[in-house]
UniProtKB/Swiss-Prot annotation:
Keyword set, alphabetical order: Calcium, Cytoplasm
Subcellular location: Cytoplasm
Role played: Involved in calcium binding and microtubule stabilization.
Family: Belongs to the TCTP family.
Assigned GO CC terms: cytoplasm
Keyword Cytoplasm: yes
Domain TCTP per the UniProt entry, residue ranges: 1-172
Organism placement in taxonomy: Eukaryota, Metazoa, Chordata, Craniata, Vertebrata
Organism: Xenopus tropicalis
Stated name of the protein: Translationally-controlled tumor protein homolog
Principal subcellular localization: cytoplasm
InterPro entries listed in its UniProt record: Mss4-like_sf, Mss4/transl-control_tumour, TCTP, Translation_control_tumour_CS, Translational_control_tumour_p
Length: 172
């Protein structure tokens, strides 16, 4: 399995269990998810040697809660955050500087294409700004990547957008 992490914070953003496609401009990964519902916090009696009594048929799931949402968000503990258009512009300026600095260290040949492509990508994001929900990594570090959540034309299928140059991949 390959885990994709934020280069700035090293927060886990997504993995290769999802359908991943590179955007036509080569700047981002689109990661397709699903809406899921899962019970968290339940303890399986079989794991602790318990045996449910036939006399007591109550539905006690041990303080468990039901969580529903996009699987990418839930599985990788992404945290929702909010932006106005102006606050996103300020954030993205700082984020681009951080990614550029990382690229200068790790992949200098990628700096020029990144700086050219990111301008058009940001214009595209700002043009569709009202469609997006914004997510940071688990630590909610304000310097880290903010992933974008949108839905396909069917209005049902969620997908997330991650800046390709802001990610490192780690094989597990």
């Amino acid at each position: 399995m390959i885990i994709y992490k934020d280069t700035v914070t090293e927060d886990e953003m997504f993995s290769d269990i999802y359908k991943i496609a590179e955007t036509p401009d080569g700047m981002c990964f689109e990661v397709e998810g699903k809406i899921i519902q899962r019970v968290e916090g339940a303890i399986d009696d079989a794991l602790i040697g318990g045996n449910a009594s036939a006399e007591c048929q109550e539905e006690d799931i041990g303080g468990a809660t039901t969580v529903s949402g996009v699987d990418i968000v839930i599985n990788h503990k992404l945290q929702e955050t909010g932006f106005t258009k102006d606050s996103y512009k300020n954030y993205i300026k700082d984020y681009v500087k951080l990614v550029k600095a990382k690229l200068e260290e790790t992949d200098p040949d990628r700096v020029k294409p990144f700086m050219k492509g990111i301008q058009d990508r940001v214009k595209l994001i700002l043009g569709n700004f009202k469609n997006y929900q914004f997510y940071t990594g688990e630590r909610m570090n304000p310097d880290g990547m903010v992933a974008l959540l949108d839905y396909r034309e069917d209005g049902v299928t969620p997908f997330m957008i991650f800046f390709k140059d802001g990610l490192i991949s780690e094989k597990c």
